[in-house]
Amino acid sequence: MNFEEIEERDGVRFTWNVFPSTRIESSRTIVPIASIYKPLNERPDLPPVLYEPVTCKAPCKAVLNPYCHIDTRAKFWICPFCLQRNMLPPQYKDISNTSLPIELLPEYSTIEYTLPRPPQLTPVFLFVVDVCQDEENLQALKDSLIISLSLLPPECLVGLVTFGTMVDVYELGYTECSKSYVFRGSKDYTSKQIQEMLGLPTSNVSPVALQQARSFQGSAAPSRFLLPIQQCEFQLTNILEQLQPDSWPVANDRRPQRCTGTALNISVSMMESVCPNSGGHIMLFAGGPSTVGPGTVVSTELREPIRSHHDIERDQAKHVKKALRFYEGLTKRVSANGHAVDILAGCLDQIGIMEMKSLASSTGGYLVLSDSFTTSIFKQSFQRIFGRDSLNNMLLGFNATMEVLTTKELKISGLIGHAVSLNKKSQNVGDIEIGLGNTNSWKMCGISPKSTYAIYFEVATQSASAPQGDSRGLVQYLTLYQHSSNTFRLRVTTVARAFADGGSPLIVNSFDQEAAAVAMARIAAFKAEVDDGPDVLRWTDRMLIKLCQKFAEYRKDDPSSFRLSSQFTLYPQFMYYLRRSPFLQVFNNSPDETAFYRHMLNHEDVNNSLIMIQPTLQSFSFEHPGGVPVLLDAVSVKPDVILLLDTFFHILIFHGDTIAQWRNAGYQNQPEYQNLKELLEAPRVEAAELLIDRFPIPRFIVCDQGGSQARFLLSRLNPSETHNTTSMYGAPPAHAILTDDVSLQTFMSHLKKLAVAVS
């Protein structure tokens, strides 16, 4: 079974591709049945389907698919999910076994309907800009914002809010001069107060009335702050060009007064009044931490350091709990109205992403960490948000909902990904809760072709009524979203997997160890948000030991007899590198960095997630000038090679000692050493290819053996050779790693002993 081919067609990978037939047998497989699903998986071969889907009767509402039984003579179909009989609509009167509509063809198990009813409002982009920055940083941000106006569709609505000590809401409909409404940054305003001060309706205005109001040239209140780009581009560009750093004086021993929380509160209040239940992005550009008003993460006094993991663990971070409550309250409001929040940081210090993470993670917003708005990491990442497809449509999707239907043998445990629960109960909701559980429907305010969700299942069948023979379980994913072309799209994916008895080799052979590693990594990262780090590591180890006890071949109490089949051989090393990854190890990372890493793990597909868990390493040498994959191990560090490390977040080129000396001597500039010049260039060419579709842009590092930046490589290598390892004559190896971490070899040795031990 080629898992990657299935992923290309349907955007889905299951941990097990043959399901155990009973609940008890399923619990014994240790790794839960889970699908890593990419709803907007790019399928250039999908033909446009410009009509409403045929659905089953309520409450089922499953969509017609290739697994339905069709009676072409009597013109009815039987739903495989509820077994109800449904008549085909009149337009299907000419259907026959040789002339089937596209949704019934086996190769179109994934199909996308373009629905005839358009959204009432075009997508909205509200820029929330921090002006507490130095002039160079602010100028770079202004330039990027002006460029972005040309990347957005001209009919999109845009707005501008700036903040420092005060918050300014700009009235783009006023063209005589730059006009803004000013709010005090230290005050906690209610939604009603903000809407009244801005002259906005305090109750949800109907989208139809809003559309009519927009026809007036700025006379209607809702249209003053959010206007189509084609109507306000000149005015907005002028305002951006005139923005100046915050003029409020800052003492030498103080931080600037930055009211990020108040600015976000005002932005959310404005959006929920002007464009409720409509697609949109609130894009926060923060140049530092919030220091005043609601959502403060650190005081203005420089003698008070911003919180660390150590402070949070010891309950010594005095602002954290209050800030978390505030931002989680904003998250509930913004997600209820279908708006995503993007957080783009341009600061060497932390800005409070740990406190604000729910705003992005629960709404499907983007997170970008950069040292400054002048860096290419920010500039290129920001522009990639507005990327286009082959038809010149923005890749962004808005205000999506996903419903998962299953046949009666399966129930849903939950979802882990960038979504919020719609709290919709149905008969296929299971008892076990993993992630966002107790529902079969979720909302994703922001969604893109890269957005990936882990959905967890349980087998509902008791042993007495186990499925017989060639029975199979069906799962249907229904994703409704607002497309950037201002149409509603419904993406439908229907997949089937067979059931087998618990001891069947079919189950073992169907294990997708890569998808399983990612599914378990998401659970571990989810647990790490609420549990202590050591507890999560112990849980990860327990699950691995149990899996090996169940599926390995061994003799009791004989570690040398331990064998794993080819379907399981990579899984233990994935778990080893997961234990050492920044998702579970917070040492040497700030709370903001940890929040960012976990956010990205919950967004990317299987292949990219595996790069995050176990980075890839390539070696370039005179024997292999084109580069070859090598072990992520200390033995790969040699003086005469160049290494290229890809951790997803960093791309690092590491020059061995000898290569670095030759380069520093300038040999590559001499004609007779052309091969050295080509060798030095080869990793850079490979790195450029890795950057083509990566988001956000990774940090690019070039270093030499023994240099300070080499720590980024050494920290991710398996420490098979450390300062405690002796080579010839008792001396440590030349490339020893100074660490007390256990090596992969020691880890596997302990795993074998524990797995074969008599319980």
UniProtKB/Swiss-Prot annotation:
InterPro entries: ADF-H/Gelsolin-like_dom_sf, Gelsolin-like_dom, Gelsolin-like_dom_sf, Sec23, Sec23/24_helical_dom, Sec23/24_helical_dom_sf, Sec23/24_trunk_dom, Sec23_24_beta_S. SUPFAM superfamilies: beta-sandwich domain of Sec23/24 (SSF81995), C-terminal, gelsolin-like domain of Sec23/24 (SSF82754), Helical domain of Sec23/24 (SSF81811), vWA-like (SSF53300), Zn-finger domain of Sec23/24 (SSF82919). GO terms for cellular component: COPII vesicle coat; endoplasmic reticulum exit site; endoplasmic reticulum membrane; Golgi membrane. CDD domains: Sec23-like, Sec23_C. It is found in: Cytoplasm; Cytoplasmic vesicle, COPII-coated vesicle membrane; Endoplasmic reticulum membrane; Golgi apparatus membrane. One of its GO terms (molecular function) is GTPase activator activity. It is a peripheral membrane protein. GO terms for biological process: COPII-coated vesicle cargo loading; ERAD pathway; intracellular protein transport; reticulophagy. Keywords: Cytoplasm, Cytoplasmic vesicle, Endoplasmic reticulum, ER-Golgi transport, Golgi apparatus, Membrane, Metal-binding, Protein transport, Transport, Zinc. Zn(2+) binds at C56, C60, C79, C82. The keyword Transferase does not apply. Component of the coat protein complex II (COPII) which promotes the formation of transport vesicles from the endoplasmic reticulum (ER). The coat has two main functions, the physical deformation of the endoplasmic reticulum membrane into vesicles and the selection of cargo molecules. Belongs to the SEC23/SEC24 family. SEC23 subfamily. The COPII coat is composed of at least 5 proteins: the sec23/24 complex, the sec13/31 complex, and the protein sar1. This is Protein transport protein sec23-1. It comes from Schizosaccharomyces pombe (strain 972 / ATCC 24843). The gene is sec231.
